[in-house]
Amino acid sequence: MNLSAEKPNRRPIRLCSAVYDAIDSEAAYRGEKAGTIANRILADELDKVAKIGIKHCVVYGSNKYRSMTVTDREGEEWYILPAKEEIEKHLPSKSVGGKSKQVSFYLSDKHIALLEEIVRLQNIIKTVDLDGKIHTLRFAVVGLLLNNKLIRETGDYEC
């Protein structure tokens, strides 16, 4: 998916300080901006999902994940999204003084459609209205970022 082929949609998402700091550190090392690195990471993860297909995406710990046999997991490529609890640990704190940084993600229509499919797959309360309208993409975005090697290597800490 080529982001430059169509006008990107800007979606600002707040990242917790730990996730942002990992991205910012990589950006400093590469001499780039944190937003550029964050957008590249998200695009890479979305491309992996697109290549594998949404039908081969599963949320860790979900009924579908638990029903998969070892053969299912080893025989085909799967994209395993973090569980809701893991994602929530890495969302910005709403407490007073909770530090977070906003990153503007520039997404193609195809990427937004794929993120919306991921939101529906995650099935997290308050992300989709009763009428089926997507309320927020942040759980999907943070889940994909957490699957990236750079973010995973930063360790298991809460924001």
Where would I find each of the regions flagged by the language model?
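Short intrinsically disordered terminal tails
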Residues: M1, R120, Y157-C159
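Short amphipathic alpha-helix starts
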Residues: E6-S25, R66, S100-L121
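Alpha-helix boundary/N-cap detector
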Residues: R14, A18, I37, P82, ...
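Charged, low-complexity interaction tracts
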Residues: P82-S95, A113, R120-I124, L130
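Short, positively charged interaction helices/loops
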Residues: D47-G98, K149-C159
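Helix-turn-helix-like N-terminal two-helix hairpins of bacterial/phage DNA-binding regulators
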Residues: M1-D44, K48
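Short, basic amphipathic alpha-helical segments that act as recognition/interaction helices
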Residues: R30-V58, T127-C159
